[in-house]
Design a protein with these regions (language model features):
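Hydrophobic anchor at the beta1->P-loop junction of P-loop NTPases
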Residues: 19
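The conserved Walker
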Residues: 23
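Conserved glycine(s) of the Walker
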Residues: 26
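Hydrophobic positions on the alpha1 helix immediately C-terminal to the Walker A/P-loop
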Residues: 30, 34
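Short beta-strand-centered segment that lines the nucleotide-binding/catalytic pocket of NTP-utilizing
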Residues: 39-54
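ATP-dependent small-molecule kinase phosphotransfer cores
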Residues: 59-139
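Conserved phosphate-donor/acceptor-positioning beta-strand/loop module used by diverse small-molecule
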Residues: 126, 146-197
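NTP-dependent small-molecule kinase module
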Residues: 197-263
Length: 263
């Protein structure tokens, strides 16, 4: 596990965590529980992404955007397809995806710059659900993961299949724009065009988003598993739901870290 040893953990003088996982698995819940004590600093990568993106030409998206209301990020990304159904052209969709990627890289790396400057003792970096799409878990020199691991203990949230099915069901009821790795997105788009035999401007935006979501979930499960294996550790969604304080979370992490290091 890159950068983490039991002795290093036991001799630490701080609790600094980068929490990773798919949207809906409890990153924000955990951050909220830790902030209640007023002794934990919270850094939201999604909020920082918005601050980077919503300038100049995109300044209209700043209206109503806050750390407690991140919905404008999804609105900015949009969905490709029929304009009469709220869709945007695929070229514009790709442009926005690329802007999001650039902003996410900057916002994620900024968390490490902040901790180096402030040296907060209790700090949680609440990463974006798409962080797994901008890193290579198998590369020991991956810039983002290496930087995070040098400043935080990387904790990935995992869940059982029933929980993932619940995420899929909720998404089906209310599909929202997502960020995809570009080659994966283009592959999905081409397969969908062949499947439906439709022109791009006739595609139902929600139908395409739903088409790709289940494949995206399976992809991200594997990516987050590789991140936890190579760069940190994993904790279960059901255990996260029981967290009521920072000390609860620290105890859970210590247990999981010990379990991993003795294997």
């Amino acid at each position: 596990m890159n950068g983490v040893t039991l002795s290093k953990w036991n001799n630490r003088t701080h609790n600094r965590f980068a929490v990773l996982g798919m949207s809906g698995l409890g990153k924000t819940f955990l951050s909220t529980q830790l902030k209640k004590s007023k002794t934990w600093e919270h850094y939201s990568v999604d909020y920082e992404i918005g601050k980077i993106l919503f300038t100049d030409k995109n300044s209209d998206f700043r209206n109503g955007f806050s750390i407690n209301n991140l919905s404008n990020l999804s609105i900015f990304l949009g969905k490709p397809g029929n304009p009469s159904k709220g869709g945007i052209g695929f070229t514009e969709y790709i442009r926005r995806q690329r802007l999001h990627k650039q902003a996410e890289i900057l916002a994620t790396l900024k968390s490490s710059q902040l901790i180096q400057k402030t040296r907060y003792d209790n700090f949680i970096c609440d990463t974006s659900g798409s962080i797994c799409e901008i890193v290579n878990p198998s590369d020991p020199n991956d810039k983002i993961l290496k930087t995070l691991s040098e400043n935080f203990l990387i904790v990935c949230l995992e869940a059982d299949n029933d929980t993932y099915e619940t995420l899929i069901r909720r998404f089906t009821e209310s599909p929202k724009p997502m960020y995809y790795e570009e080659p994966f997105l283009r592959m999905l788009w081409e397969k969908y065009l062949l499947k439906t035999n439709q022109d791009e401007n006739k595609i139902d935006p929600d139908d395409f988003i739903l088409y790709g979501y289940k494949a995206l979930v399976e992809r991200r499960k594997k990516l987050f598993y590789m991140i936890s294996k190579n760069w940190g550790l994993s904790v279960n969604f059901n255990d996260i739901r029981k967290i009521k304080s920072g000390s609860d979370f620290v105890k859970l992490v210590k247990t999981q870290l010990n379990n991993k290091l003795v294997k």
